[in-house]
Design a protein with these regions (language model features):
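Residue at a conserved register position within TPR or TPR-like alpha-solenoid repeats
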Residues: 19, 39, 59, 100, ...
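Structural signature of alpha-solenoid helical repeat scaffolds
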Residues: 3-4, 43, 83-84, 122, ...
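"A position-specific structural signal for the A-helix of alpha-solenoid helical repeats
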Residues: 14, 18, 47, 53-56, ...
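Structural signature of alpha-solenoid helical repeat junctions
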Residues: 7, 47-49, 84-88, 126, ...
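Amphipathic alpha-helical segments of tetratricopeptide repeats
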Residues: 33-40, 73-81, 114-121, 152-160, ...
């Protein structure tokens, strides 16, 4: 079923946002306020558009700074009421969570992210971005095993959504944690995700990575990373080399050596030549 045509007022707002994203934001405050007033009442009344405009104005920093969080929460609650599980609802959750994190309220940010879930029908690309952020926050709290689960889920959602740069980031961040300890008998990541349960006690956890999961990630990363090995700080290629040495994968090392003439990272070159 085709999406309905946007209303003239919604089209006007969409055009305004295109201008803003092109760098023409000088009149955003005035024009968005005019659209907001029309969306609130009369023949143009549109609750979804009102929430969209208020969310963008809050993100733009229009109004009292103390009220930005209140505005973002109002928008999230409004989208939850009129279109739960929608793209706009998911974006409003991400914005609210980011606001909490920027305020240093990590636990509130994590709690907000929990409102994004497959069972609620949220788009996979938003689920992927959410899991990526949750994984990063958990890693910052040293809850590495749980962080690995979320990063693994993120790479799956992001890959399915063809968000290649974000999927690569999730894969590399997972690998960076996983290489702390790898063996052949640890549960696979998919099993860990499926069997995950709320913990009865607070604190950090650790479960080693399974070597097959490491191989899966590196085999996905290697051709992409080798396509361009330039740059003087290539920690990503360093992770691949670490994984190759840990798992005794001579083929991975050989692939890196073949690119030695193009590699510019002095530390990586030294390791390859040692």
């Amino acid at each position: 079923m085709a999406n309905p045509e946007p209303s003239p007022l919604m089209s006007e707002f969409q055009h305004l946002m295109i201008q803003v994203r092109s760098g023409n934001s000088a009149e955003f405050a005035v024009k968005s306020n005019d659209i907001l007033l029309r969306a609130r009442s009369g023949e143009h009344k549109d609750s979804e558009l009102e929430a969209l405009v208020r969310m963008e104005r809050a993100l733009f920093g229009i109004g009292d700074e103390e009220r930005i969080g209140t505005e973002l929460r109002w928008c999230m609650d409004r989208f939850n009421s009129i279109s739960p599980g929608s793209l706009n609802h998911g974006i409003s959750i991400l914005n609210m969570a980011a606001w909490h994190r920027n305020k240093g309220e990590t636990m509130m940010a994590l709690a907000t992210h929990s409102n994004l879930s497959p069972s609620s029908g949220h788009p996979k690309q938003l689920l992927g971005l959410s899991r990526l952020e949750v994984g990063r926050m958990l890693a910052s709290l040293d809850d590495l095993s749980t962080a690995m689960r979320h990063l693994w889920a993120a790479r799956g959602f992001l890959s399915e959504s063809e968000m290649v740069p974000e999927a690569l980031a999730a894969s590399l961040e997972w690998l960076d944690i996983a290489l702390d300890e790898v063996n052949d008998i640890a549960p696979r990541m998919q099993e860990r995700i499926q069997n995950a349960k709320p913990r009865n006690e607070s604190g950090t956890t650790w479960i080693p990575a399974n070597s097959q999961d490491v191989r899966e990630v590196v085999e996905m990363l290697l051709p992409v990373l080798l396509a361009d090995v330039s740059g003087t700080d290539r920690a990503d290629l360093g992770l691949v080399l670490d994984a190759a040495e840990m798992l005794e994968e001579e083929g991975w090392i050989a692939s890196l050596v073949e690119k030695a003439e193009d590699i510019q990272d002095p530390r990586l070159l030294e390791l390859l030549q040692s």
